[in-house]
């Protein structure tokens, strides 16, 4: 069999950190980057006699996420203990939701909304701490222990690393739009485990799956899945069997490595958490959260295409990130959508990309660009001068009004003044006027250039064209 005779079957378990200032069962801060073990309560450290107190904000964010993914909200859910030993898990168990998750049966569309990927469940659970390894010692940092995670579990509907990457991008986009997770993979706010197996094309039987743990970038997700697919194909084609293992992806080697044999649910001895009551959610609460959801990216994109006549590519770019969409929305409060698209996606993005920064860090905020567009639209400056002003704004952070005043860039629109300048140019270049009138029409650009030279680019192009064409044809 060749590689084309095999089909990959992939499911993702995504761990999304809830955008909450406190942990799931304690009031400890979740701020990133604090000194080791400075954000640890007695509950987080599992001191005997301490009891968990549920953070209901995390419950609301899980419901919010479920509704954004068109899922069912379980009106009665509860927490369970997942029993295992690990140095950075001080309780000796993790509080999670195994039997009755808060959300089930959702979906995400990928491949231009042509493919549905089913979401089996979303449940809340505690994050573990972090082990820090040095040469002969291992340190444990419990700052992360107890942080609220949403585990978003897909069905095995993905068939390639590209689809897995698109699923992650789409999920991250939705989470950022609704504000339930910041989606920052570099800080570990969003990471995933990939369950990968292969089977002969056309088969409906699942192969033996391996789980690749803790993938924290889109690039690594694709590399790890591609390597694992090829590894499993080679094993099967050599006549051997796949071992159901838990794997780690070695970034430096670009290979997966066995971490341990994969456990089954029975190995964790799940049982209901005795220190927490069931979570009861009313329909009124669900409806209230639903009504607070913002316009989601697919809805926004469709509106831009249908109502604002923006092409699909630009609509995709603008809605790809909530911050970009918000910036654009600010611009179109006062300006034509096509003008806003050009200045956002061409002028601003060009400068941001060159500087290596994103729109959140842009030195030019939406209201500042909107003011610049005001001056272009009302004729105070030309579009050409507008780009010059924009460059200075980007470098200095100064408002357009101040730059125009300081640089004396206000456009000359006085017809009498421009007419006098054109008369002088015509009188000084009679030979070229004769050539133009004899059919050498390309010389028109020469006359425009001379006007701009004498006015330092400040003459209104519309006024120049109107007067110049009239004088050259007479």
From Swiss-Prot:
One of its GO biological process terms is: glutaminyl-tRNAGln biosynthesis via transamidation
Q: Which reaction does it catalyse?
A: L-glutamyl-tRNA(Gln) + L-glutamine + ATP + H2O = L-glutaminyl-tRNA(Gln) + L-glutamate + ADP + phosphate + H(+); L-aspartyl-tRNA(Asn) + L-glutamine + ATP + H2O = L-asparaginyl-tRNA(Asn) + L-glutamate + ADP + phosphate + 2 H(+)
- Reported EC number(s) for this entry are 6.3.5.-
Question: What InterPro entries does the entry give?
Answer: Asn/Gln-tRNA_amidoTrfase_suB/E, Asn/Gln-tRNA_Trfase_suB/E_cat, Asn/Gln_amidotransferase, Asn/Gln_tRNA_amidoTrase-B-like, GatB, GatB_C_1, GatB_Yqey_C_2, Gln-tRNA_amidoTrfase_suB_CS
Disulphide bonds in the chain: none
Keywords attached to this entry: ATP-binding, Ligase, Nucleotide-binding, Protein biosynthesis
Q: Molecular function terms in GO for this entry?
A: asparaginyl-tRNA synthase (glutamine-hydrolyzing) activity; ATP binding; glutaminyl-tRNA synthase (glutamine-hydrolyzing) activity
The cross-references to Pfam families, in alphabetical order and at most eight, read: GatB_N (PF02934), GatB_Yqey (PF02637)
The answer to whether keyword Amino-acid biosynthesis applies is no
Q: Which HAMAP family match?
A: GatB
By sequence similarity, the record places it as follows: Belongs to the GatB/GatE family. GatB subfamily.
Q: Cite the record's note on assembly.
A: Heterotrimer of A, B and C subunits.
* Name of the protein in its database record: Aspartyl/glutamyl-tRNA(Asn/Gln) amidotransferase subunit B
Give the species: Wolbachia sp. subsp. Brugia malayi (strain TRS)
Gene symbol here is gatB
């Amino acid at each position: 069999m060749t590689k084309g005779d095999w089909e990959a079957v992939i499911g993702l378990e995504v761990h999304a950190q809830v955008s909450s200032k406190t942990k799931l069962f304690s009031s400890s801060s979740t701020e990133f980057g604090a000194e080791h073990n400075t954000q640890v309560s007695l509950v987080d450290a599992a001191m005997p006699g301490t009891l968990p107190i549920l953070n209901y904000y995390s419950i609301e964010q899980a419901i919010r996420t479920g509704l954004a993914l068109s899922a069912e909200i379980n009106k009665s859910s509860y927490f369970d203990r997942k029993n295992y030993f690990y140095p950075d898990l001080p309780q000796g168990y993790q509080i999670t939701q195994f039997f009755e998750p808060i959300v089930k049966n959702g979906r995400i569309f990928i491949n231009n909304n042509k493919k549905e990927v089913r979401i089996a469940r979303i449940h809340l659970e505690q994050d573990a701490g972090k082990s820090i390894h040095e040469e002969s010692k291992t340190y444990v940092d419990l700052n992360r222990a107890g942080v609220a995670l949403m585990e978003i579990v897909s069905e095995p509907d993905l068939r390639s690393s590209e689809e897995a990457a698109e699923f992650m991008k789409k999920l991250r986009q939705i989470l950022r739009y609704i504000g339930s997770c910041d989606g920052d993979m570099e800080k570990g706010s969003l990471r995933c485990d990939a369950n990968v197996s292969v089977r002969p094309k056309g088969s409906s039987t699942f192969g033996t799956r391996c789980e690749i743990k803790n993938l924290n970038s889109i690039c690594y997700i694709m590399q790890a899945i591609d390597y694992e697919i090829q590894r499993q194909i080679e094993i099967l084609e050599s006549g051997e069997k796949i071992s159901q293992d838990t794997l780690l992806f070695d970034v430096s080697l670009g290979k997966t490595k066995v971490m341990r044999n994969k456990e089954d649910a029975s190995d964790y001895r799940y049982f209901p958490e005795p220190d927490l009551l069931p979570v009861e959610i009313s329909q009124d609460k669900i409806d209230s959260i639903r009504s607070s959801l913002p316009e989601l990216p697919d809805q926004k994109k469709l509106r831009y295409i249908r109502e604002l006549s923006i092409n699909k590519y630009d609509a995709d770019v603008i809605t790809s990130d909530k911050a970009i969409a918000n910036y654009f929305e600010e611009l179109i409060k006062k300006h034509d959508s096509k003008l806003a698209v050009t200045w956002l996606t061409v002028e601003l993005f060009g400068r941001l990309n060159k500087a290596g920064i994103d729109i959140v860090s842009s030195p030019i905020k939406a209201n500042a660009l909107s003011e610049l567009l005001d001056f272009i639209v009302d004729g105070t400056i030309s579009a050409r001068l507008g780009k010059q002003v924009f460059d200075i704004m980007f470098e200095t952070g100064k408002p357009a009004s101040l730059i125009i005043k300081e640089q004396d860039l206000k456009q000359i629109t006085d017809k009498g003044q421009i007419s006098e300048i054109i008369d002088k140019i015509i009188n000084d270049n009679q030979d070229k006027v004769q050539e133009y009138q004899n059919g050498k029409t390309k010389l028109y650009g020469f006359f425009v250039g001379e006007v701009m030279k004498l006015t330092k680019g400040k003459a209104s192009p519309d006024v120049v064209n109107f007067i110049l064409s009239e004088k050259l044809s007479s």
